[in-house]
A protein has these predicted regions:
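S-adenosylmethionine-dependent methyltransferases
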Residues: 1-125
Length: 125
């Protein structure tokens, strides 16, 4: 998968503006990952419930005040909804509803969100 990401970046002439990187959730962010990147693309990351807190921590470490994470999420199990509840407490989240293709992928229980660092510094309850 990593080599495919690198190939897509090259094919779309995005070097040096975009980079692919492997992240192990909950670990120190590797030096090759830009500090507080402008855009993070995340897809199909919600699949192993014990790792949910590690994913939240990693996103908190990555997101700066001007960062946005485009987070694609497929709802499969109740546990997946628990992740979304955790994320909504930790971040400012908004479902993207103005995508012309949303109807087709929503039918497959796939949803797209923006995730941003919480501006107020307070968690929603």
């Amino acid at each position: 998968m990593f080599s495919l990401m690198e190939a897509n970046i090259e094919l779309n002439n995005l070097i040096p503006n975009a980079t692919a990187a492997i992240l192990n959730w909950g670990e120190t962010i590797p030096s090759q990952v830009p500090s507080k990147p402008d855009v993070i693309l995340a897809a199909d990351c919600v699949y192993f419930e014990p790792a949910f807190p590690l994913l939240i921590t990693t996103l908190q470490d990555l997101l700066g005040p001007n960062s946005v994470c485009y987070f694609c999420f497929k709802r499969r199990r109740r546990a997946d909804l628990r992740f979304m509840k955790m994320a909504k407490k930790a971040f400012d989240m908004e479902e993207i509803r103005d995508d012309p293709g949303a109807e087709s992928y929503n039918r497959e229980n796939i949803f797209l969100y923006t995730i941003r660092a919480r501006r107020s510094g307070l968690k929603k309850e």
